């Protein structure tokens, strides 16, 4: 093979991406640009070989979130490739969420060589530092250009990335300087591909595996001695942060700990907990709000981060007993109330270590403790009120959707809840309806950013998918529909149109004038959603009767592509009804 720069640029790009494939990468999101041309050409060839899925996105911000959705739903590392300059800055929102959600993405950014840095060269910035604050590692190939790297250099980089992501899943930034020429002649490309196919394409490489990583799992005597599983306690399961590939093991371990304790389980809608787990309590968030005095115990086992519930946070803050917090894939502090002992090696390791200290007799299944029966009675009272009130009229409200939708969307089909109101409403009103399926929400940074692109990424892996979102969250990321073939993915968007950020009505309405509230917080846009959907070639249906939702879902599933079901919310009626039903529950 010729050693010309153009050949080396392509060859090293092929080698790099092929090594990523060998560590499990299946999907790459490609953004437009010239400096990244060698990576784009290499990705195109690997796509032709049938070993890499490549999807293009003209918006780097959407691309980052789309890749995050793919990584979350698959459990695999995903790649994003961009050109230089501000393109890299647009990756930051997705990198922030990937960091906090502990999901593995490698952002590969093309750059100018060192000779063009800090001298005013066009589109040349300190992009290598843009993502530093949120990435697990920031790496670079040779600063003078990737053509200066050898085989071992490229292999070493990929091995470092694999090891880092096994130890601490999250985003990694790989910055790659390219010297011109960035294109390659057809003749030289054929020569380069022949060498690559002969020497590298089918070459096997040994990489660190999950069970081989040198990860020190400590036995915390203080934590295990603090728990007394023979006495009453509660298991509270927050949003699941582990890999979806580990979810079965997580649920098996949860089943073991519940079995030997008989404790009640409070499960977040996106906890990943199986619906058939013994000890589950419905309406637990409302029970805490109504009367947490019925919860008589002195220890709590918390799994994962805190749910989006002020009632739960207050309950835990006031709780005087022992709190143990078990984390998945997350070594940072996760307890904002600062009252727990934290264990960072995951529930499976926690249970294995704990049971290793128990006798066979102690490991036997125990009946449900009396507290479960008490809490379930309270939950049933609340369910009775909800079932009575929800169909008193046909008007659609947000809390009705949270209760009704998980009952009518097919129970084995996944759901994604956008941040802001939906995740909070479903926590309060869904009656554990999400636990029959995979349910996703991105709570790492708790923003509405990237909602549609995330959902489309999930839908590439697991579909049909239902996205439940407010209007501002959807319009904020409407560019997601520009990602390659995204409108052909089987995604139903349930658009809750309240013409603004309705969550702020609950927070600030009492102390602001109506117009002031609109301008400063609600920010209504009065979008013509029918015209907007048409512009993106996405079918849309408008539903105003709650009883018509089941047939609307039948329609959306029959379309087998991206569609929008829009429901308009009368905000004033919503708030009145919500207030009345909560009052009835709390006073019952």
From Swiss-Prot:
Name the Gene Ontology biological process terms: menaquinone biosynthetic process; phylloquinone biosynthetic process
Q: Which cofactor does it need?
A: Mg(2+); Mn(2+); thiamine diphosphate
What Enzyme Commission number(s) apply to this enzyme? Answer: 2.2.1.9
Bound cofactor: record note: Binds 1 thiamine pyrophosphate per subunit.
Q: Which reaction does it catalyse?
A: isochorismate + 2-oxoglutarate + H(+) = 5-enolpyruvoyl-6-hydroxy-2-succinyl-cyclohex-3-ene-1-carboxylate + CO2
The record's keywords, sorted A to Z, are: Magnesium, Manganese, Metal-binding, Thiamine pyrophosphate, Transferase
Recorded metabolic or biological pathway in which this protein acts: Quinol/quinone metabolism; 1,4-dihydroxy-2-naphthoate biosynthesis; 1,4-dihydroxy-2-naphthoate from chorismate: step 2/7; Cofactor biosynthesis; phylloquinone biosynthesis
Top-rank taxon, per record: Bacteria
Which InterPro entries does UniProt cross-reference here? MenaQ_synth_MenD, THDP-binding, Thiamin_PyroP_enz_TPP-bd_dom
Quote one Gene Ontology molecular function term. Answer: 2-succinyl-5-enolpyruvyl-6-hydroxy-3-cyclohexene-1-carboxylic-acid synthase activity
- RNA-binding as a keyword? no
Check the record and name the SUPFAM superfamilies matching this protein. Thiamin diphosphate-binding fold (THDP-binding)
Pfam families annotated for this entry?
A: TPP_enzyme_N
Matching NCBIfam families: menD
HAMAP family attached here? Answer: MenD (MF_01659)
Described purpose of this protein according to its UniProt entry: Catalyzes the thiamine diphosphate-dependent decarboxylation of 2-oxoglutarate and the subsequent addition of the resulting succinic semialdehyde-thiamine pyrophosphate anion to isochorismate to yield 2-succinyl-5-enolpyruvyl-6-hydroxy-3-cyclohexene-1-carboxylate (SEPHCHC).
Q: Which family does it belong to?
A: Belongs to the TPP enzyme family. MenD subfamily.
Q: How does it assemble?
A: Homodimer.
Protein name from the UniProt record: 2-succinyl-5-enolpyruvyl-6-hydroxy-3-cyclohexene-1-carboxylate synthase
Query: Gene symbol?
Result: menD
